[in-house]
From Swiss-Prot:
GO terms for biological process: protein import into mitochondrial matrix. The chain crosses the membrane at residues 108-128. PANTHER family: MITOCHONDRIAL IMPORT INNER MEMBRANE TRANSLOCASE SUBUNIT TIM21. Residues 77-107 are mitochondrial matrix. Component of the TIM23 complex, at least composed of TIM23, TIM17, TIM50 and TIM21. Its main location: mitochondrion. Keywords: Membrane, Mitochondrion, Mitochondrion inner membrane, Protein transport, Transit peptide, Translocation, Transmembrane, Transmembrane helix, Transport. It is found in: Mitochondrion inner membrane. This is Mitochondrial import inner membrane translocase subunit TIM21. It comes from Yarrowia lipolytica (strain CLIB 122 / E 150) (Yeast).
């Protein structure tokens, strides 16, 4: 007589143990109507909880539950397999080609960025070397032109409103080019800089020649290079010495050769 009440009491307990089970919703379409059914999925943890909490459930009931668990697991696996889209070989090839295209596109953009950075660095290097450093051609030319404007002899022969031009190797086009220097190292390790350019005024036109030599004794940037000679040659006039060696020293070098001839190449050529 006690068996039935105990079995009756065990059903709510079993149902309570099955409450945390996962619900699987199934859509069934029949004509214009769609039916949604929720089916509880029993996991192994639920079976172990059920066996511990309801000792009066028969082995037959547990076996039925286990069987239903396996069936529900198979149904869930089949549902996942059906829900996952199948990718064909053609689509996989297109995906690989798309990835390759993105890779090359990013590589192209990266190359453009690196090239722009390199060009920016070259521009900055040119600005620093030519405009800031005392050994730059622009700094040397500006310094020499200011020295010419300060010289009274040059201004008297050339006239006012001085203008400068390039070395003039290629006619008018060559004279319109900015002055370019030539550089070399002597046997003492000092750097030498040579520069020639034309200077014209209202009256005449002359050619300026200069040589700078590295001053290893001075640590000042303004005195890093000193004039070895700086002269201006004007047709029909004597050579005018702007800076560097004194006039008598330059004349002495020209007249102290053997038999009155200066052997070798002159420094101002």
């Amino acid at each position: 007589m006690l068996t039935r009440p105990l079995l009756a009491l065990s059903r709510p307990m079993a149902l309570g143990a099955l409450r945390p089970a996962v619900l699987v919703r199934t859509l069934t379409t029949a004509g214009p109507t769609t039916t949604v059914r929720s089916t509880p999925i029993i996991t192994p943890s639920h079976l172990s909880t059920l066996s511990r909490s309801t000792p009066f459930v028969s082995n037959c009931t547990l076996s039925l539950l286990k069987r239903s668990f396996h069936v529900s697991s198979d149904a869930r696996s089949a549902a996942k397999a059906e829900g996952k889209p199948k990718v064909s070989a053609y689509e996989k090839a297109n995906m690989r080609l798309a990835k390759i295209g993105v890779f090359f596109q990013l590589s192209w953009y990266l190359g453009i960025i690196l090239a722009a950075l390199g060009l920016f660095g070259l521009v900055w290097y040119y600005l620093i070397m030519e405009l800031v450093m005392p050994s730059g051609d622009v700094r040397i030319f500006n310094r020499a032109f200011k020295e010419i404007e300060k010289n009274e002899d040059v201004m008297r022969v050339l006239g006012g409103q001085l203008s400068s031009m390039g070395e003039g190797g290629g006619g008018r086009w060559g004279r319109n080019q900015p002055p370019v220097s030539k550089r070399g190292i002597d046997k003492y390790g000092r750097e030498h800089i040579w520069m020639n350019f034309y200077v014209s005024g209202d009256i005449n036109e002359g050619r300026a020649k200069l040589e700078l030599v590295q001053n290893t004794d001075s640590k000042l940037s303004s005195e890093r290079f000193v004039y070895r000679y700086f002269v201006v040659d004007i047709p029909g006039h004597k050579r005018i010495y702007i800076a560097g060696n004194a006039a008598e020293k330059m004349e002495k070098k020209k007249s102290t050769g053997w038999l009155g001839v200066n052997w070798g190449k002159s420094d101002d050529e």
